[in-house]
Amino acid sequence: MAGPQDRPRGRGPSSGRPQRPVGGRSQRDRDRRVLGQNFLRDPATIRRIADAADVDPDGLVVEAGPGEGLLTRELARRAGRVRTYELDQRLARRLSTDLAQETSIEVVHADFLTAPHPEEPFQFVGAIPYGITSAIVDWCLTAPTLTSATLVTQQEFARKRTGDYGRWTALTVTTWPTFEWQYVAKVDRTLFTPVPRVHSAIMRLRRRPQPLLRDAAARSRFADMVEIGFVGKGGSLYRSLTREWPRSKVDSAFARADVHHDEIVAFVHPDQWITLFQLLDGSRGGAARGPGDQRGRRGRPGGGPRPDGRAGGGPRRDAGGRRTGDGRGGRPRPPRGGQA
């Protein structure tokens, strides 16, 4: 089970003739450094990760960075099938040999970020390099058939994304109607070999059986509201929203959602965001516009749908509310930090 060092964007050592040790480092040491390989060998933590994943005994599990395969074997004992992606050619070859008798395990020597999303429902599990955490999270969030993702990430990342500090990120709020984010447990850095500089944590994403906002168009409008709130120049969420919605409507919505007027946007709970949206959706007009001006933000009367049926004029979004294009018919954007 590999992870958590940063993986550089450059290429690793060539696969040609054996390289002579440099500075006392063996080829294996250099591979670990290039590929971000820190191995988790603590059996109790391995079981804790598998417990948190709560895998379907008849389902597919996709794993990234199996390393020495300890978590892979534990998952195979609990799941129907495991498909694991290993970028390190040496480890992939060894895993294929060691697991040859395990018919439920498929070892794929490839960069996980280039892997297609499975067409069938699946769960993701992995201890991943810090440097590509955001790219892997994006891969998971954009997978239509993903049911859950259990990741070992840098502890700081896990705490920020799950609201463990009492603050919430725009990514978490935007995807909240579709995904639940959970901080599971700290993983002490001393449990890895070699020992990284910071602690890790188990974080879990779970797709909700029914989205909190069931209409895809509503989720897209919700994502637009979240964007306005987080990038607005008003200083507070209240000031940002009153630039786009009537002040009286915002006052009423804040009172019913129990949000103070001076609340900083990061401290507003995602559930409060949902309430605000449900109370404000459909009343968008903006305090700065005159009483006779009902034009929407993009210059169409009432901010109504485009002739092509798309609501509003903002960027295209997937079912989870995440951007998938530039709103002008452009091609979908690749995940941040990922490979196109």
Swiss-Prot record:
Q: Which UniProt keywords apply?
A: Antibiotic resistance, Methyltransferase, RNA-binding, S-adenosyl-L-methionine, Transferase
Q: Name one Pfam family in it.
A: RrnaAD
InterPro entries to which the protein is assigned, alphabetical: KsgA/Erm, rRNA_Ade_diMease-like_C, rRNA_Ade_Mease_Trfase_CS, rRNA_Ade_methylase_Trfase_N, SAM-dependent_MTases_sf
Role according to the record: Involved in erythromycin resistance.
Q: Tell me the segments the record calls region Disordered.
A: 1-37, 284-340
Q: Where is the composition biased (Gly residues)?
A: 301-314
The text of the family note is: Belongs to the class I-like SAM-binding methyltransferase superfamily. rRNA adenine N(6)-methyltransferase family.
- Protein name per its UniProtKB record: rRNA adenine N-6-methyltransferase
